[in-house]
Amino acid sequence: MKTTIKQAKDHLNQDVTIGAWLTNKRSSGKIAFLQLRDGTGFMQGVVVKSEVDEEVFKLAKEITQESSLYVTGTITEDNRSDLGYEMQVKSIEVISEAHDYPITPKNHGTEFLMDHRHLWLRSKKQHAVMKIRNEVIRATYEFFNKDGFTKVDPPILTASAPEGTSELFHTKYFDQDAFLSQSGQLYLEAAAMAHGKVFSFGPTFRAEKSKTRRHLIEFWMIEGEMAFINHAESLEIQEQYVTHVVKSVLENCKLELKILERDTSKLEKVATPFPRISYDDAIEFLKSEGFDDIEWGEDFGAPHETAIANHYDLPVFITNYPTKIKPFYMQPNPENEETVLCADLIAPEGYGEIIGGSERVDDLELLEQRVKEHGLDEEAYSYYLDLRRYGSVPHCGFGLGLERTVAWISGVEHVRETAPFPRLLNRLYP
């Protein structure tokens, strides 16, 4: 009977065949231990010399790392393993023998591993991170579908930039200029006027020359836009979403979190409502903590965000940033028009901003004024301005960076480990 490592638990004391790769092995004179993986998990195969044909035991000792195999044997309980079971191997069939696999069991430097990212993905820890990434995506769709959102796919090639910055990848679109999308927000706002609540999930591109552990050039973003929703209501949806994702990973990725040695007690504390601190109060807090490199009207750097998040040891919303450091489309704060109705959600443990969101300007005259103040081409944003001409309503939106969120939940040091093939400042290969 053919099965997988994950499904093998349903076949205790039965003979099964599993297609797998050999990740490592060790042997004594009488027993060989094969570390097997098949994409669904990792399992040990035990080959006892006295219980198999001589050729099988010889093969078990000689087979090379990352060779592909069909392994047949009996699934037995083993409380010492992460899975709780292993295979007593009876026969081995080599599908393809690997030669001189470059990533050996010894330690390798990061650059070497990134050069061999196509192979590094096979390792136990990298496999665990990708499984957690997959669960975050699955839980995302579950949350938005259950809450009545419609998925919309905004274009990746655009003629304008929602952030109004110069950090764009430029390309030619026949005889026109085009850019790789920084965000689908403007298109999602249009879709929200048709469907009420919408979300998207796709790649975004930032031509930022950043080399921090938080930054990728290409990353995936989950964005939501909601009509007839105010800023406070949007924050509630955001914290419910993040809490749902964290709980889903805790429930469905126990083994992966164990492999990564993640301190799950920190994740178990994540619950609504999240703490909130205004930008003004955050500045005062940082001053009281001895930070003299930040003044009102300046954006926070990584050390500032880390200090604020560590104070709460939970995801925390920093709200109502100064108007001058935020994009043109954010709604003024009626209590202080020098600030806007926005919030960044900062993850604890130094992972930084994972969500940025705001209430959007819904008044045509004000939005036209903002477009001019930011030096933007009004014609390029004419479709966006149309949304305020024809039945404008209060509405809000936000975007969550997938890789930073996965890094935080997984506890990995750098976001490069949370993308299958990360695009970094000096890396376009593999």
UniProtKB/Swiss-Prot annotation:
GO terms for molecular function: asparagine-tRNA ligase activity; ATP binding; catalytic activity, acting on a protein; nucleic acid binding; transferase activity. Keywords: Aminoacyl-tRNA synthetase, ATP-binding, Cytoplasm, Ligase, Nucleotide-binding, Protein biosynthesis. One of its GO terms (cellular component) is cytoplasm. It is found in: Cytoplasm. It comes from the Bacteria. One of its GO terms (biological process) is asparaginyl-tRNA aminoacylation. InterPro entries: Aa-tRNA-synt_II (IPR004364), aa-tRNA-synth_II (IPR006195), aa-tRNA-synth_II/BPL/LPL (IPR045864), Asn-tRNA-ligase (IPR004522), Asp/Asn-tRNA-synth_IIb (IPR002312), NA-bd_OB-fold (IPR012340), NA-bd_OB_tRNA (IPR004365). It holds the Pfam family tRNA-synt_2. It catalyses: tRNA(Asn) + L-asparagine + ATP = L-asparaginyl-tRNA(Asn) + AMP + diphosphate + H(+). CDD domains: AsnRS_cyto_like_N, AsxRS_core. The keyword Ligase applies. Its EC number is 6.1.1.22. Belongs to the class-II aminoacyl-tRNA synthetase family. Homodimer. This is Asparagine--tRNA ligase. It comes from Staphylococcus aureus (strain MSSA476). The lineage of its organism: Bacteria, Bacillati, Bacillota, Bacilli, Bacillales. The gene is asnS.
